[in-house]
Design a protein with these regions (language model features):
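Intrinsically disordered, low-complexity segments enriched in small/polar residues
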Residues: 22, 27, 54-55, 60, ...
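Compositionally biased amphipathic helical and low-complexity segments enriched in hydrophobic
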Residues: 6, 36-38, 52, 88, ...
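A short, exposed loop/beta-hairpin motif centered on an aromatic-Gly-Thr core
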Residues: 64-96, 100-101
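Amphipathic, interaction-prone secondary-structure segments
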Residues: 32-66
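Polybasic, proline/glycine-rich intrinsically disordered low-complexity segments
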Residues: 87-126
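Intrinsic disorder/low-complexity signature
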Residues: 3, 61, 103-105
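Negatively charged, low-complexity tracts enriched in Asp/Glu with abundant Ser/Thr
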Residues: 1-46, 111-126
Length: 126
């Protein structure tokens, strides 16, 4: 089964990256979909992925965790052909960011255990 899933990943088109637009827009209202990993004690989530369909039918994503990240919008130039692909790329980016945070000494917003929880959550979304 894993070999079959790996083949599906190989067939996925690469994300579409456009230059960042300094004066570009982000979604001001609610994005089409928001996935959150709740924090056990705080009001804000440990991790959040926003997905939104752009005017041309392509999907955009935004990723937040450990007090940082960005809101979904065309400003960031991150696009995918399908919602499924956008979710995959967002989860992959979140995993990469959480691994970078784990490698730093000061994880002031999330503990190492919480960062590992973020990684496991994002892997479950892929």
């Amino acid at each position: 089964m894993n070999e079959q899933l790996d083949m599906l990943v190989l067939m996925r088109p690469a994300p579409i990256r456009r230059p960042i637009l300094a004066d570009g827009d982000v979604v001001q209202g609610e994005p089409h979909e928001t996935l959150r990993l709740p924090h056990p004690r705080r009001a804000w989530p440990m991790a959040c992925i926003e997905l939104h369909q752009h005017d041309g039918g392509m999907w955009m994503w935004g990723v937040q965790h450990a007090g940082g990240g960005y809101k979904v919008g065309p400003k960031w130039g991150r696009f995918a052909y399908t919602r499924y692909d956008a979710l995959y790329f967002a989860a992959d980016e979140l995993i990469e960011r959480a691994h970078r945070s784990l490698s730093r000494i000061d994880t002031q917003f999330l503990s190492a255990a919480q960062l590992r929880q973020v990684i496991a959550w994002a892997k479950g979304l892929e």
